[in-house]
Amino acid sequence: MNIIKINDNSNKLFYIGGVVRDELLGRESLDVDITYVGNAIEYCSKFGEVVQVNPDFGTVRVAIPSHPSLCDTHSPIGTRGEVTVDFASTRSESYPKKGHLPVVEKIGCSLREDVMRRDFTINALAKSVTTGEIVDYVGGLEDLKNKKLRVLHDESFIDDPTRIIRGLKFATRFGFELEEHTKKLQDEYLVNINYDMSYKRVKKELIETFQPYYTPHPSYGHPLPVGARGGVTFQKFIDQKIYKLVTPNDVEIPKVNVEGLVKKYCTPHPSPLPVGARGEEKPPSCSAAIWLIYVGILGDLSRLPLTKIEQKILDDVPKEVLKSDFELYKTFQNARIETILLYAILKDEVGARHYLDDLREIKLDITGKDLQTLGIKPSPKYQVIFDEVLKAKLQNPKITKTDEIEIAKKYLSD
């Protein structure tokens, strides 16, 4: 556990949630904050420099001098020799509008009240900073032992439907299963969904569920192997009809091996693809929208607040099957990998693989300067020439620059 131990005898400081869960599972947790039973803002003002405060939620960030008599830490040390630590006040919440952000009812509530607002019992464990004692009000230790995900009350998914997606994330990350009654509650909600919910939060959970398998993520500190659990997560996403949170339409799992495509063509660390036909730099082979490869198959993503780039990825997926190498190349030469893989899943896997395996590295050596040297004046005709040369090179990638110039010479008399 990457923590800071503060010398405090009040026994009011606790680690709560994922950090306790991860420690008990023997996993590293990089996102660590400390909860104070009471008002953390008032408490922290006594011993450190307050650098950020959110009074609405009772959270505070404090810069604490890294002196041995005050604290013992493995956290990053600041430039002035201090440690920055996040503290949270215990708080109780309610959901006056189901499916949307909760409202803070009380800051400085009891520890029991604070843990009762959590999603699953395994995330409702508390550990005393002072004594190291584990406090378990809801049976989280037993569920952790039995690898079960259990909600804290029957209204949990109604209050916050995104907990269903988080359950999927925890199930595949830790190899856990929904406890029987929790599974029943989930199934009931997915049959009677209230689509008046915060889709900004839905999108956030979808990204955190599918994205971490391919890119660095704070919860891991390093990328997991590509495709390590993405396929399992996707299968559960479809089989359990969790996709119903996004669209009421029925969806069948594609016959294409989605996990295999992602594993082969998406790298954990972004790296440039080969340049295009005229020297354009290709987009990276793995970007921040890999999650769209999975969610994009739903078709109707109108409820999700997509960025311009994310919407473009979807809009750029060809509606029809591309029939020639030239069409494949011209369509995908500047496309993102997510667009190409969505085309593979939805339209033509063979064509997409052919482009990625055989065509995308092909580039022209001839340039506009070469055409000027031949006496061809700059005009829209240049693009016609480049396209004809490209067609020839797609048929025979071994042709040289000299061969390309010979093809261009055919247009001297035009």
Go through each PLM region and give its residues.
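Catalytic cores of the polymerase beta-like nucleotidyltransferase superfamily
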Residues: M1-H222, R229-P270, G276-D414
